[in-house]
């Protein structure tokens, strides 16, 4: 079986690409949460599902009643884990490569955080796409951040919205979505 398509999906505050403060996201964007769920669960092939890969700290930050994330295979990475299928919905693995050897019937793989996983895997050749929700705020310096993406975006090409629409499928994509003081847009990037 061929390896599935691997994409990073993340919401980040421009211009510094901040993604968190004290282990939490410093915003609650209702439509962005819906987009995340729709994109990470949507499949086009029958009898397949998608996988979400996250670090152990991200897994632990999800309230227990919401774990595992439904309708997706949840892969939790930690250097201290042995590669092990826990049940039909959860896999523990020590690396992205070893986790992909344990999966079958997976259409797409989405890396969902946290920062250490994002910043390590951005340079992994398995990652072919970035789905970045670019968030703007009138005074971004007023939003407390202690966690940032270290993405070499000069090695990536931002795709037109039509390519994003093809990639995400049925999901309706608005422009300049406003929630509170935040404005955001969904973007797709591919390697140069």
UniProtKB/Swiss-Prot annotation:
<feature type="binding site">
    <location>
        <position position="112"/>
    </location>
    <ligand>
        <name>substrate</name>
    </ligand>
</feature>
<dbReference type="GO" id="GO:0005739">
    <property type="term" value="C:mitochondrion"/>
</dbReference>
<dbReference type="GO" id="GO:0046655">
    <property type="term" value="P:folic acid metabolic process"/>
</dbReference>
<dbReference type="InterPro" id="IPR017925">
    <property type="entry name" value="DHFR_CS"/>
</dbReference>
<feature type="domain" description="DHFR">
    <location>
        <begin position="5"/>
        <end position="191"/>
    </location>
</feature>
<keyword id="KW-0521">NADP</keyword>
<keyword id="KW-0554">One-carbon metabolism</keyword>
<dbReference type="InterPro" id="IPR001796">
    <property type="entry name" value="DHFR_dom"/>
</dbReference>
<feature type="binding site">
    <location>
        <position position="72"/>
    </location>
    <ligand>
        <name>substrate</name>
    </ligand>
</feature>
<keyword id="KW-0560">Oxidoreductase</keyword>
<dbReference type="GO" id="GO:0046654">
    <property type="term" value="P:tetrahydrofolate biosynthetic process"/>
</dbReference>
<feature type="binding site">
    <location>
        <begin position="32"/>
        <end position="37"/>
    </location>
    <ligand>
        <name>substrate</name>
    </ligand>
</feature>
<dbReference type="InterPro" id="IPR024072">
    <property type="entry name" value="DHFR-like_dom_sf"/>
</dbReference>
<dbReference type="GO" id="GO:0046452">
    <property type="term" value="P:dihydrofolate metabolic process"/>
</dbReference>
<dbReference type="GO" id="GO:0050661">
    <property type="term" value="F:NADP binding"/>
</dbReference>
<dbReference type="InterPro" id="IPR012259">
    <property type="entry name" value="DHFR"/>
</dbReference>
<dbReference type="GO" id="GO:0004146">
    <property type="term" value="F:dihydrofolate reductase activity"/>
</dbReference>
<comment type="similarity">
    <text>Belongs to the dihydrofolate reductase family.</text>
</comment>
<dbReference type="Pfam" id="PF00186">
    <property type="entry name" value="DHFR_1"/>
</dbReference>
<comment type="function">
    <text>Key enzyme in folate metabolism. Catalyzes an essential reaction for de novo glycine and purine synthesis, and for DNA precursor synthesis.</text>
</comment>
<comment type="pathway">
    <text>Cofactor biosynthesis; tetrahydrofolate biosynthesis; 5,6,7,8-tetrahydrofolate from 7,8-dihydrofolate: step 1/1.</text>
</comment>
<feature type="binding site">
    <location>
        <begin position="78"/>
        <end position="80"/>
    </location>
    <ligand>
        <name>NADP(+)</name>
    </ligand>
</feature>
<protein>
    <recommendedName>
        <fullName>Dihydrofolate reductase</fullName>
        <ecNumber>1.5.1.3</ecNumber>
    </recommendedName>
</protein>
<feature type="binding site">
    <location>
        <position position="118"/>
    </location>
    <ligand>
        <name>substrate</name>
    </ligand>
</feature>
<dbReference type="GO" id="GO:0006730">
    <property type="term" value="P:one-carbon metabolic process"/>
</dbReference>
<feature type="binding site">
    <location>
        <begin position="113"/>
        <end position="120"/>
    </location>
    <ligand>
        <name>NADP(+)</name>
    </ligand>
</feature>
<feature type="binding site">
    <location>
        <begin position="18"/>
        <end position="24"/>
    </location>
    <ligand>
        <name>NADP(+)</name>
    </ligand>
</feature>
<feature type="binding site">
    <location>
        <position position="11"/>
    </location>
    <ligand>
        <name>NADP(+)</name>
    </ligand>
</feature>
<feature type="binding site">
    <location>
        <begin position="56"/>
        <end position="58"/>
    </location>
    <ligand>
        <name>NADP(+)</name>
    </ligand>
</feature>
């Amino acid at each position: 079986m061929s390896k599935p398509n691997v994409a990073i999906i993340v919401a980040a505050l421009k211009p510094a690409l901040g993604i968190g403060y004290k282990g939490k996201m410093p915003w609650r964007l209702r439509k962005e949460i819906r987009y995340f769920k729709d994109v990470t669960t949507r499949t086009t092939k029958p009898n397949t599902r998608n996988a979400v890969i996250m670090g152990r700290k991200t897994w632990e930050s999800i309230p227990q009643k919401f774990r595992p994330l439904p309708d997706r295979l949840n892969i939790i990475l930690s250097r201290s884990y042995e590669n092990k299928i826990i049940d039909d919905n959860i896999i523990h693995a020590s690396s992205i490569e070893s986790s992909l050897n344990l999966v079958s019937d997976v259409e797409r793989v989405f890396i969902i955080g946290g920062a250490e996983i994002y910043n390590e895997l951005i340079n992994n050749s398995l990652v072919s796409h970035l789905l970045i929700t670019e968030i703007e705020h009138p005074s971004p310096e007023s939003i407390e951040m202690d966690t940032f993406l270290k993405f070499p975006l000069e090695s990536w090409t931002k795709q037109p919205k039509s390519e994003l629409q093809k990639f995400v499928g049925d999901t309706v994509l608005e422009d300049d979505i406003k929630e509170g003081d935040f404005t955001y847009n969904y973007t797709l990037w591919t390697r140069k």
